[in-house]
Amino acid sequence: MATYLIGDVHGCYDELIALLQQVEFTPDTDTLWLTGDLVARGPGSLDVLRYVKSLGNSVRLVLGNHDLHLLAVFAGISRNKPKDRLTPLLEAPDADELLNWLRRQPLLQVDEEKKLVMAHAGITPQWDLQTAKECARDVEAVLSSDSYPFFLDAMYGDMPNNWSPELSGLARLRFITNAFTRMRYCFPNGQLDMYSKASPENAPAPLKPWFAIPGPVSEAYSIAFGHWASLEGKGTPEGIYALDTGCCWGGELTCLRWEDKQYFVQPSNRQMDMGEGEAVNA
C-alpha cells in the first residue's frame, strides 16, 4: 500500500505509464498523487486524462495552470495554441465527459495522517492550513458550477498580489488561483511576485522562493508541488518536495514514493529544451 507522488505530466503519457510500471504501481492497493498540469505540450494529453480518470479513488490530483487554461479553451474563452497540442483532446468524442470531470478536481490535497499537503505551485506563506482549505473550496465551488466560464474569463491577471481576508468576488478568486497554480516568488511579507522566473540564485532582491519564507503550513506539514521545472527538483528545504523536473521539455518525469522517500525517474522521450519557456500563466 504505497503512495506515489508524480510531478507535472504535461501530456507525456508514455513516460507516465513507463514510470508507473517501473514502480509497479497497483491501483487496487496503491495511491497516486499528481501535482497538476496533466495536459499540454506533450503529445498525449487525451490519453493522460482518460487514464487518470479511470483510476477513480486510486488517484489524488490537483489542478494546475495548464489544466485551467485547457478548461478556458474548452469554454471558448482562450485560444487553442498549436504548441499545447490539445486538439486531439478537444475533438475527442469523450471531451465533454473528460473536461467536466477535470473541472471538478481540487486545488489542494491534504493528508492529515501523513502530514502532507499538495498544491500545484505551493502554499503561500500568508496562509495557514484552514485558510488554504477555505480558499481552495471557494474556487472549486465556482469551477464545479454552471457559471465556471465566467470565472475562467476573469481569472487571468496578476492582481491582487497580496492576501487579505477582506478580498471578495473575482479579486479574491484570482488571488487564490494565482497562489495555488502560478506562484513562484514572494516578497518577504509573503506578497506574490508574478513576474520573475529567474533561478533562485539569480532572483532580484528582495524576492525569495515562496518555500524560503516560513509559513504556518510549511512549519507543520510537508508540502509537495510541481509547476517550477527549472528547479529540477533541487534547492528546497527539508520537507518541501519539488516534483516537476521538466519531462515535457526533455527532462524527466519524477516520482517520490512517500513511505521511504525514494525517488524514481523516467527520462523524457523528447530532446532537452528547457529554453522553450513555460506556457500561458506558467
Swiss-Prot record:
Record GO terms (molecular function): bis(5'-nucleosyl)-tetraphosphatase (symmetrical) activity; phosphatase activity
GO cellular component terms attached to this protein's record: cytoplasm
InterPro entries from the UniProt entry: ApaH (IPR004617), Calcineurin-like_PHP_ApaH (IPR004843), Metallo-depent_PP-like (IPR029052)
Disulfide bonds: none
GO-annotated biological processes: RNA decapping
Catalytic activity reported: P(1),P(4)-bis(5'-adenosyl) tetraphosphate + H2O = 2 ADP + 2 H(+)
EC number of this enzyme: 3.6.1.41
Alphabetically ordered keywords of this record: Hydrolase
PANTHER family per UniProt: CYTOCHROME C5, PTHR40942
Family the UniProt entry places it in: Belongs to the Ap4A hydrolase family.
Annotated function: Hydrolyzes diadenosine 5',5'''-P1,P4-tetraphosphate to yield ADP.
Protein name: Bis(5'-nucleosyl)-tetraphosphatase, symmetrical
Species this protein is from: Salmonella typhimurium (strain LT2 / SGSC1412 / ATCC 700720)
